[in-house]
Amino acid sequence: MNRKVLKVIDGETVFPPPIWMMRQAGRYLPEYRETRKKAGSFLDLCYSPDLAVEVTLQPIRRFGFDAAILFSDILVVPHALGRDLRFEEGKGPLMTPIDADEIFWLETEGVAKRLEPVYETVRLVREQLPDETTLLGFCGAPWTVATYMIAGHGTPDQAPARLFAYRFPEAFEKLLNDLADVSAEYLIEQLGAGADAVQIFDSWSGVLDEDCFERFCIRLVARIVQKVRAVYPQARIIGFPKGAGMLYAGYREKTGVDMLGLDWSVPLSFAALLQEEGAVQGNLDPLRVVAGGNALDEGVDAILERMGQGPLVFNLGHGITPQAPIENVQRMIDRVRGGKS
């Protein structure tokens, strides 16, 4: 088995570095938009294995990325917990905000089993992927998932969730613990279905102060990692605490993740120091892919120059945007793999 992404996660230096993109199955691809229309709703797309397999494989067929990531959404976990969830064009995910009393009535028993269509997608993708392509599963980190459950939608700085945590600490701690336990079961099921590694997305960790980052992010991700490794001791886990800044230091050691996903705001000098401790993933600004040209080339070259001699999975610093031209994605891949565009 020659899955380059797994080699990097294990600490090997691979050159040229393997590459994939967060949200690589998405609206920038015309074939994705066609499949999305067939599905009806975004959730129907997530829960229909045949269609979810198709969109997971589309960027692999087109670009030959070194990893496929399961097509789903971080909010299927609260949906499985019984919370309503819908996606509206231009508004993103919408939920009825949970209140403190409701948290104590959340029933977590057997929740992961309700997500069987997701595991079927994993099984089918693994069967159809080229053998050298890594298959990644994922979940949202408890803090990030909780922010949507509390506000009912995304907010610029997640003030509703932060205020909720200060006002209702007991309820908030229970919510985070419940989400961690269900998420661990969810990842265990994905690994059992054929995922090679999993990523924990903490997209809103950057809005927290240091104390809350330790209590709401690090503690809960560590809890997930411990529970997953109790079942799969060799499980490879990627942590992505977007916006963590200086708090990236120590994150790997405290949580137990194998590889650090870095957002584009992380200085490359700091990223290189983090790489001395183990594998890193990232961290091109997604808007450089939209811009193309010299802006794209210079961004790619800077990352390769600073981190290409160590364990690196080349990625964006967050998800690719719908506005990204396909030719710019190909230009980025060619440049990473050694062909100048």
Curated annotation (Swiss-Prot):
Query: Keyword Lyase on this protein?
Result: yes
| InterPro entries noted in UniProt | UROD/MetE-like_sf (IPR038071), Uroporphyrinogen_deCO2ase_HemE (IPR006361), Uroporphyrinogen_deCOase (IPR000257)
Tell me a GO biological process for this protein: protoporphyrinogen IX biosynthetic process from glutamate
- Reactions mediated catalytically: uroporphyrinogen III + 4 H(+) = coproporphyrinogen III + 4 CO2
Question: Which CDD domains does the annotation name?
Answer: URO-D
Q: Give the UniProt subcellular location, in the record's own words.
A: Cytoplasm
Q: Where does substrate bind?
A: R23, Q24, A25, G26, R27, D73, Y148, S203, H318
Instruction: Provide the primary localization.
Output: cytoplasm
- Positions marked as site (Transition state stabilizer): D73
- UniProt cross-references to Gene3D superfamilies, sorted A to Z: 3.20.20.210
Q: In which pathway does it act?
A: Porphyrin-containing compound metabolism; protoporphyrin-IX biosynthesis; coproporphyrinogen-III from 5-aminolevulinate: step 4/4
Which GO terms label this protein's molecular function in UniProt?
uroporphyrinogen decarboxylase activity
Taken from the UniProt entry, a GO cellular component term is: cytosol
Q: What EC number(s) does the entry state?
A: 4.1.1.37
What the entry lists under Pfam families is as follows: URO-D
Q: What class of enzyme is it?
A: lyase
Which keywords label this protein? Cytoplasm, Decarboxylase, Lyase, Porphyrin biosynthesis
**Oligomer and partners:** Homodimer.
Q: What family does this chain come from, according to its entry? A: Belongs to the uroporphyrinogen decarboxylase family.
Q: What does this protein do?
A: Catalyzes the decarboxylation of four acetate groups of uroporphyrinogen-III to yield coproporphyrinogen-III.
In Swiss-Prot or TrEMBL terms, this protein is called: Uroporphyrinogen decarboxylase
This protein's gene is called: hemE
